[in-house]
Amino acid sequence: MDTNYIIETKNLTKQYGSQKSVADLNIHVKRGRIYGLLGRNGAGKTTTMKMLLGLTKPTSGEVKIWGKSLQGNEKKLLPRIGSLIESPGFYPNLTATENLRIFATLRGVPNSHAIKDALDLVGLPYKDKKLFSQYSLGMKQRLAIALAVMHDPELLILDEPINGLDPIGIAEVRSFIRELCDARGKTILISSHILSEISLLADDIGIIDHGALLEEESLAELEQKSSKHIRFTLSNTAQAARILERNFHETHFSIQDDHNLRLHNMELPVGKIVTAFVENGLEVSEAHTCEESLEDYFKRVTGGEGIA
């Protein structure tokens, strides 16, 4: 396994009876980046995150964090991680500050300003008499995130952190998650079923469906795959690539398989390219312009059902 990854899994699997909730999952979370685990509800996101945190034991496979196996190193690794998995058990008759003070004591958080800093980050008041039981769903979600970051962890694992938030709240959460990564150097793994939010936030994306990882690439690479392009169907894509590089000094293309190639530079003359292919012995059966949205791409990858 590559020690350049903060999180790396190898064939991670969780099986309940005959049903695999997660199947042979291999994800790679890079240092100082936001990794978005994207999939519809029931795709296996929460189960994956629970295995990464030692809350659920894998049926098989391995989890490595900072290059070390999680199994046997939980006491060393887990204190360096902040997490939001489902809903924390806050006391309903205490304020946000009182709740966090209890958790700070249990965790031995030494920084006296940690509670206020965490509440400031998520936009909750430090001196507030409102009880947790009086909080809206969005405020409860903010407090859960404050708890996750209070001990200044190096790595954050957040399961659906924008659940229950209104559009303004979602934008604010997006902003401070981005700040945690860009300004404070945190590595963040975030899950969501909302494509539009992941595409606005993540640097790298893993698409999970029915427990299997379908794609894992940077957002820029995925956007290129779904952008406007010219698709060529021909007899030999490797030879076509050499012709594009030699005759047109062009490298902005991607080979899909032996017979399909995508050209991403829309300014090149298609007629001249086809002529060059034919003159060099290639059979060209199709050449046409395609435009696929990021949503269309995800629908295609997940078998047509799509993601919100």
Region annotations inferred by a language model:
Residues 228-301, 308:
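Short, charged/small-residue-rich alpha-helical element at the C-terminal edge
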Residues 78, 100-101, 116-119, 171, ...:
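Generic structural signal for individual residues within well-ordered alpha-helical segments
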Residues 175-264:
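ABC transporter nucleotide-binding domain
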Residues 13, 97, 121, 195, ...:
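Alpha-helix N-cap/helix-start and coil->helix boundary motif
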Residues 1-5, 304-308:
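Short, Lys/Arg-enriched, disordered terminal segments
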Residues 105-108, 303-307:
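Non-catalytic alpha-helical coupling and interface elements of nucleotide-dependent molecular machines
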Residues 4-9, 14-190, 195-209, 213-215:
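ABC transporter nucleotide-binding domains
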Residues 2, 95, 138, 223-225, ...:
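Short coil/turn motifs at beta-sheet boundaries
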